[in-house]
Each structure stands twice: as structure tokens, then as C-alpha cells.
């Protein structure tokens, strides 16, 4: 599920925005699989090797392919992919004066792991 232009919700565990969900179709229960996503576009589940590949639109540039390790689901620390704190992309309009407050709140660090997030398998800039 995307962040619906409410960036901060991608890092809020109480919100479903910016999360990948596992939904039980028999009882409609759900489980958060991962968080920190901007705009997920596609999922591929490799049942044999127990992983998910997720494609995601970044902001201006910074599209991602993320590896979600299914065997880590349910561990104490949820897999977090960093949005809106880390991204290979930039905010639309770049680092202009009008975007100054946006970058202060959502800096889009180029490293994910340096800030405690899972690094994408691949990023595409420009995209």
C-alpha cells in the first residue's frame, strides 16, 4: 500500500500506509510484512526460496527493487525500507528554497543501511 501522499505514515507502525501486507482471505486478518514504502507497484513471491521481490516508484528518480525476506517476517524488528527518510531519488522541485522544509523533515538520505533501513537490491536514477 502506498503512502497516499502522507509520507510520515510510512514510518508509523499504527498506519497501514507505506506497508506491504499479508491478508488472510478466509478471515480478512492482516499482518504487516514490511514498512517504509512510497509507492509499491508489483510483487513477486518466490514460494520455493521464501522471498518477495517488490518494485516501487521513488520520487523524482529512485525507483527501487526490494528483496523482502519472508523468513524474517514476525521477528522483533520489522523490515523497514526507509521511505521518506532514505531514497535514491529527490523531492519534486529538487533542493530549492521552497523545498527546504520538506528536506529538513524528509531528508532522503542516499544510504539506507547507515540509517537503520534495508538497502534496495537495485535503484534506478533517473527513472
Per-region residue spans from a language model:
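Beta-propeller domain segments
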Residues: 2-127
Amino acid at each position: 500500500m502506498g503512502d497516499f501522499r502522507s509520507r510520515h505514515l510510512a514510518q508509523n507502525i499504527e498506519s497501514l500506509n507505506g506497508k506491504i501486507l499479508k491478508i488472510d482471505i478466509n478471515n480478512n486478518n492482516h499482518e504487516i510484512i514490511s514498512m517504509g514504502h512510497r509507492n509499491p507497484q508489483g510483487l513477486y513471491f518466490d514460494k520455493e526460496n521464501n522471498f518477495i521481490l517488490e518494485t516501487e516508484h521513488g520520487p523524482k528518480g529512485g525507483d527501487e527493487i526490494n528483496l523482502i525476506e519472508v523468513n524474517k517476517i514476525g521477528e522483533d524488528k520489522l523490515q523497514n525500507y526507509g521511505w521518506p527518510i532514505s531514497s535514491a531519488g529527490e523531492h519534486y522541485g529538487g533542493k530549492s528554497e521552497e523545498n527546504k522544509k520538506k528536506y529538513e523533515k524528509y531528508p532522503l538520505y542516499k544510504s539506507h543501511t547507515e540509517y537503520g533501513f534495508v538497502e534496495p537490491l537495485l535503484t534506478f536514477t533517473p527513472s
